[in-house]
Amino acid sequence: MLTFLSDVHSLGLKTAQGLQLTESFYWDLNDSTRAWSKRFGERMNGRMPTMVHAGVYSAVTHYLKAIRAAGTENSEKVAEQMRLLKVSDAILPEATVRQDGRVLRPFYLFEVKKPEESKGPYDYYKLVREIPANEAVRPLNEGNCPLVK
């Protein structure tokens, strides 16, 4: 089951407590994610971003950096730059794009807090463990992607 922070917010901690889930992003992971999420929340009526919001931000930011580095909007040249450049932004301090286009980055196993553990709105997760990038995705040689030669 795919569960987002917004789902937990809608369910409430009383209902969602104890649920374990994986996410690639949580607003309260570190100082950088907290600062980015604060700016997001100011524009979104106090709502905190989900991993989808953060992922789109990282993807578009990386794409624009790749266009700049390629000096063109040619899709093949931009895709090549996307694979060559490190993904580095407020969400992902260091990630890479594989030959098949998959972003290699850690994921996180979280457990939803009990109501009494939360300090306020959107303080919903406690980190159980970080899942390293190499464990979070299928190995390149098992994917059968036509981009991999």
Language model features with spans:
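Extracellular/periplasmic bilobed ligand-binding domains
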Residues: 1-22
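Extracellular/periplasmic ligand-binding modules, especially the Venus flytrap/periplasmic-binding
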Residues: 26-86
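Solvent-exposed, acidic/polar segments of extracytosolic/periplasmic ligand-binding ectodomains
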Residues: 84-86, 90-149
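Active-site-proximal beta-strand/loop segments in catalytic clefts of secreted hydrolases
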Residues: 1-3, 22-26, 100, 112-113
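Short, solvent-exposed loop/turn elements at domain surfaces
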Residues: 8, 29-30, 117-120
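Ligand-binding "clamshell"
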Residues: 10-17, 41-43, 90-91
